[in-house]
Amino acid sequence: METFLFTSESVNEGHPDKLCDQISDAVLDACLAQDPDSKVACETCSKTNMVMVFGEITTKANVDYEKIVRDTCRAIGFVSDDVGLDADNCKVLVNIEQQSPDIAQGVHGHFTKRPEEIGAGDQGHMFGYATDETPEYMPLSHVLATKLGARLTEVRKNGTCPWLRPDGKTQVTVEYYNENGAMVPVRVHTVLISTQHDETVTNDEIAADLKEHVIKPVIPEKYLDEKTIFHLNPSGRFVIGGPHGDAGLTGRKIIIDTYGGWGAHGGGAFSGKDPTKVDRSGAYIVRQAAKSIVANGLARRCLVQVSYAIGVPEPLSVFVDSYGTGQIPDKEILNIVKENFDFRPGMITINLDLKRGGNGRFLKTAGYGHFGRDDPDFTWEIVKPLKWEKPQS
């Protein structure tokens, strides 16, 4: 059996780039909660003792940007300079302007267009991916890397590993077998965790705690063997972290947000964007399409692409690739996709209920992945029943 290795990485919520994603989406939530028609393009950057939010927002909502920044930082665990940022005492800079009137007239006609007439907020192409290798219809390498990061945060916040600090990264290499285009995980080849820690703990204690409290509960035993390699804080020291260690910026973790390097990516980030931005809404609808194809048994693995022109409602193209795993030809799968999914931005917004913010709905997406999550707020994860006839063998 010929196998190959594939690696996916993740970062947890205290990573400076992810901090910025979460602040941008917390701003989006706050705007949509009061004004579902808010037009939001909110970026965040951070460095030592400073967070800045900037971008274009047109909203009737009354939003306290500084409070959102401080609350988000505090919830993650950035409560002192020692851990990388002090939520209550850091500088918060705000530079928010209205959406460009040129964009507004072209996309939504200054709020006058009906949903089916709303154009794409920009050009671009987005990809959705699904695979039958996990119950989430997501790649195992990505699922494990993401869950390790989430578990790191869990054991930090519940006191199991009190020496942990907010920043951290994970990476998992999986050995795979290609079964006629479908991906079959064989074993976990390598587990890498680099986590921020306080001064009190030794490297041996870090490694022991990570194996016992993070790796064991996350990675199924069947994937681990005596040959599995563990790199646990391989650099030896990671005390300085968060924005103190590295500058953070919204939209720099787009592969972590999606499929861990599997499938393809059009390059557009998600966080801080309202649903007229097809970088986000387009990527969500093609995930639903790809997942529905696999969950309905049409294929074991699937990639769906959609593309747009600014101001134009209808997509320019839709593409399907089943990697040779389709029960019927890809051309027929494409027809089923077009019959069952409306790719116009205004209709995606309605069908996936994307104007509903608040209660941390989009904030949740900004940590630990936008896809493969079992949460009713992740409406794009709902599998649509697709009618098709299996060919007679």
Curated annotation (Swiss-Prot):
Keywords noted in UniProt: ATP-binding, Cobalt, Cytoplasm, Magnesium, Metal-binding, Nucleotide-binding, One-carbon metabolism, Potassium, Transferase
GO biological process: one-carbon metabolic process; S-adenosylmethionine biosynthetic process
The name this protein goes by in its record: S-adenosylmethionine synthase 1
Subunit record text: Homotetramer.
Predominant place of localization: cytoplasm
EC number: 2.5.1.6
NCBIfam families per record: metK
